[in-house]
Amino acid sequence: MNNLTSRALELQRLAHELIYLGVDGEPIYSDTFCRLNKDVLLQCDSLFLLRGSTSDEEANLCLALLLGYNATIYDYGNKERNKQSVLDRAFEVLEQLPASLLKVRLLTYC
């Protein structure tokens, strides 16, 4: 697994953790919530300008970015524009993907 794929999968994991924070009945601490929001948004912004070298890699990256941007509460003024750009990229890559779980997951978030 290359570096971009591992970074995208890590962002997916963090965004999932943020989305489901507290669902297990555990208390939500504000410092944990704020740290996760900041970490997810910083990772999104660091991956935003990158492109996958294959359609699967690009799809995983788009999925991670959509998960991350939708999970965070922070916005420094460019989040909606970035989300639209990722959606445009996702629609381009969806046409190239074969039927797969990755394609279904990406369609779900589009």
Q: Where do the protein language model's features map onto the residues?
A:
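Small-residue hotspots
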Residues: A8, A15, K83, A90-V93
